[in-house]
Each structure stands twice: as structure tokens, then as C-alpha cells.
Amino acid sequence: MELASRIERLRTGFIRTFWVANILELFERFAFYGSKAVLAVYLVEKVGLGPLGNTLVGLYGFAVFFLPILAGTVVDRYGFKKSLAACFFIFSLGYFAVGLAGLSQAQALVDSVGRVQYVVGALLLTAIGGSLIKPCIVGTVARTTDAATKSLGYSIYYTLVNLGGALGPILALQVREGLGIEYVLVMSAVVSFGNLVATLMFFDEPGGGTPAGERRTLGKVFADMVVVFGNFRFISFLVVFSGFWIMFWQIFYSLPFYVRDVLKFERFEIIETVDAWTIILITVPVTALMKKIRPIMAMTLGFAVASASWLIVASTVSIPLTVIAIAFFALGEAMQAPRFYEYVADLAPPDQVGTFMGFAFLPVAIGALVAGPLSGWLVQTYLKEGGNPGGMWVVCAVIGFVSTALMLVHDRFFRRRGDA
């Protein structure tokens, strides 16, 4: 009966705008994760930036996940349709600009600007476009669902996000092998332009907009940042938790070089998708199993499992074991991710939970910012020069285990009595 009810809600419970928004999100994830899969290798080798390329990839990741804090004010002011159109227009320009850096026909332009300056500008332009997507799509899901359909609506949204993360790198592989790595960025630009056209043609502004008096202004955002960053108990936990994301981003920043140069498997994009496919398959049963465990223990177990996965990679040079290790990492991710937001909500002052939760994704941004230069150092030191590629993954494991210990220490000293 429950299954039949869910199928009926799936068939009749959502208006067209809900489906349009989610399809746009799926194709945007194709473009984002397709480019993400090759970006480190592309900047380091094709564009010729060396280890600095890894640092810039990290800077780009930081901007993509930090700027939505500010972008929400733009969405509130101009609405979802205009913001989405601007997002995909900027994405189209940004991805294409990044792709130009690797095209022989554009080298005169790139060199006239300065190779590093050009790439930094192109990446930041792309990140500005990326900052608009999440407030628009998540906001549309919120406005086009009700109490009966909201849970299923968000489930559909997150499933499509993960599906995009799983298929994007595979599409990138086909383009890289067929045309060249620089054309992966061109592909992302074309997909983004297609999303722009689809937005203008099919996306309707959902009802229930934010009243003018309740819209967030930049002044309000910066005031909230002062409050949140001034709360040591809250912000210190986010910094500690960023250790997980430092490990996670190595799947895109360091692993491609290892898979190609050490494992001698040229199609590194396939290995990058293991995490996403595993998450799709195991999230529901793992979440059910972890539901009765206290959030701090669920996160600790998840951190420990994810950290240990890198020791599997370090232990031997093996494609099957590397695949198993990344799946093991995804298991750790699935164990802790749902409980993170529950725990962070408990850390926030009771009367300011909404404000503080708006900054809960900062660990993703901090992790990317640190993971970029760390990746450049790991690849150069252990893989290119040191002849000890396993050492890269030992360092990642140490970061994870130290973060796990610090998380327990933080919980011991800062958890309020009676908290979960």
C-alpha cells in the first residue's frame, strides 16, 4: 500500500516546473562533474600549470561552494527564472573560457592575458555561475511540493544529483577519448547553453515567492557571517569536519594521476564514479541502519571507515582494490552524511538554527580550498618525484584519523548536556 501510494504521488503529485527544474539540475550535474573529473589533469598538464593547477582547482571548488551564501540574495531579488538563466549563461561563458586555455587556436589570447591570470579569471567566472544553481533548484523543489510530497520531492532531487555525479565523468571520458581533454570543457559549455534555452522555454516561475520584507540583503548576509564566525563552538566543528572533504576531493584532484600513472589505467574517470554509484546504491539501507545510533557516533564511524579506505589504496597497486577502497570510502560517507546536519543543528543556538544552518556546507568549501594545494604537493612529492605513490594515501588517511579524533574531542568539550 505504501509503495502504491508513493507511485501515485510520483505520478500526480508534482507540477511541470518541479520536473523541469530537476531535469535542468541533472544536466547541470553532467556538465559540472564531467568537467570536474578532468579539470585537475587538464590544468596541470594540458594548460601547463603544474602543481599550481591543483591549487586553482581547489580555489574553484571553494568559490563554487562558498559563493551561494551571497548568491541567495540575488535569487531572492530577481526570482528563480531570471537567476537560472543568468546561471546557465555565465556557466556557458565560463566553461568555454576554461576550455579555450587548452585550445591551440586561443593560445595567443591566453598568453596576452597571462596564462595564470586567464585561468583564474575563467574559473572564477564559472564559479559565479555555479553559485546561483543550488538556491534556484532547491528553492523550486521547496515551492513546488507540499507536506505530502516534500520528502519524495527532495529524494528525487538528491537521486538526480548523484546520478549526474555518476554519469558526468563517463560522458567526459567519451569526449576526452574522442576529441581531446579540452573539449570536455567545451561540452560543459554546450550543455549549459542547452540548459539556458530550456530555462527560457520551459521553466515557469513557481508561486509563493519570498515577501519583500523577508528577503535577505547582502548586509544581512554579512551580519549573519559575523554572528556565525564569532561562534567558536560552531565554526570550530565545521573546520574539524572539513577534514572529511579534504579526503573526498582527492578523488578528483589526486586519484586521476595515480590511476593513470601508477595503476596504468588510462580511463581514470571510471574510477572517479565509484563513489557516486556506491552512494546511490547504499544510502537508503545504510541510513536505516545508522538511524538509532547517536549522531556523533555515526559520524565517528563514518570518518573512521572513510579514513581507513585510503590505507587500502596505499597497501598495494591494484585496480580492483582501489575500486573497493573508493566504495569503502562511500560507505563511510553514507554513514555520516545524513547525521551531520542533525548534529550541526544541535550545535547552533536554539533561536538561530536557521541562520546557522545556512553555513552548514562550509566544510565542503574549506575542504576544497585545502585539498587543492595539498593535492599538488602530494602528486609532486610522492608520485612524480619521490617514487612512493602509496605515501599520498597514507597522508590522506592520517588527515582523516586526526579529524576523527578532533571531532570526538570537540564533542567532549562543547556538546551541550542533553544534546544528541
Q: Which residues does each predicted region cover?
A:
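Transmembrane alpha-helices of Major Facilitator/SLC transporters
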Residues: 64-66, 267-292, 302
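Multi-pass alpha-helical transporter architecture, strongest
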Residues: 194-206, 394-420
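C-terminal ends and interior cores of transmembrane alpha-helices
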Residues: 89-114, 304-317
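Juxtamembrane intracellular "pre-TM" segments in multi-pass secondary transporters
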Residues: 2-15, 209-239
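A membrane-interface helix-boundary motif in multi-pass transporters
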Residues: 113-116, 174-190, 377-401
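Glycine-rich segments within core transmembrane alpha-helices of 12-TM secondary carriers
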Residues: 151-176, 192, 360-372
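Helix-to-loop junctions at the C-terminal end of transmembrane segments
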Residues: 67-80, 176, 281-295, 379
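Extracytoplasmic gate region of multi-pass secondary transporters
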Residues: 32-40, 232-272
